[in-house]
Amino acid sequence: MKKIIFWVAAIGLLAFFMFTQFSSFERKGLRRFEVLNNPSQEVIVGVCWPFSVNQDGMADGLQMALDEINSKNLAGGHTIRLIIRDDSFNSVKQKLIAREFADNPEMSAVIGYYDDGPAIQASSIFESSRLLHLLIGANNTDMTSHGFNYINRTVLSSDRIATKLAKLSTNHGYRKIAILWEEDAYGEDLAYQYQVGLDQLNAKVVYQWSYSRKNVDFRLLVNELKMIDADMIFFSGIEPIAGDFLRAARKVGLKTPVLGAFNNTPEMRIHAGSAYEGAIFFGFYNVHSQTPENQLFVKKFFDRYGRNPDTWAAQSYDALHILAKAIKFTGSRNPLDLSYAIRYADAFEGANGRYKFDRAGNLEDKPLFLYVIQHGVPVLIQ
């Protein structure tokens, strides 16, 4: 009887805590609307990204866009101010940053996140606190299926990635696939959607394996894979663990081609070592695209930074310009005004292609590109 009373009390306390927390974010949302409806020319935008870990072009793309928008009055008389936070792939930091942004009643929008897990948690917080969330990196399919009003995604969702990836895989002759995935919101979703895509193309999944980020040991896996008749291994997980897998696989002489869901980050290169050579991964941006918008972007970026832009430079640059266009169109700092303006606007032609959103805030379509590492450098597979 005491145990029953204990569990009833515990569940009651948990429900009370969740309700009060939700109510707190709701109150913050009401306060945000009050503040942002007051006249002001400044629009505050939060940014959350693992800058120190990824060391990519995200910050540079943002800064270039910010300078253009503010100097050329592209936000219709408003100026944008960025509050930039580095989450360092640290779960505690990620939660604190999301709460910090939700607590700021003067903030209109947030740009981020990279990883699906913290993005899912943050999106619920931002929805409750009425804060526009521009997702530029996280792909989880379900994030835009809850009827949220404040989320807009400028990158493909996992189901759309997987459909394209399955076609690319089979078009390159890979029809017997081993699928490995990380047990998280990104890895599981992408692996499942990829298998659905393969089933529709009559390709065969010959082996499956999952791993936890907290307890990774690939020794048994790579030896088992040597015994599997697979044309290709699909690794549905991110860096740096993907690099550890490549190193372990090549160490035992596993020569099967690997297609991964990772990015070309410093951590990935360090963890993979020489085993990185020949690895294949997909990307969302082609720096050599011949569209006028991309050619101009690449030239400006190279002139300013002395190097070509990467995916996240293009993604962040476009996201801030999309937001500026919504601010100019609405003349508002209100997150709901901006969210609807983005969803229902005509297609935006950016550095990274065409952006058109559906009613749920999901990006409708974009090309997907395959890259192979040759002499340590990603090379586009034609």
State the predicted function of each range.
Residues K2-Q382:
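Extracytosolic ligand-binding ectodomains
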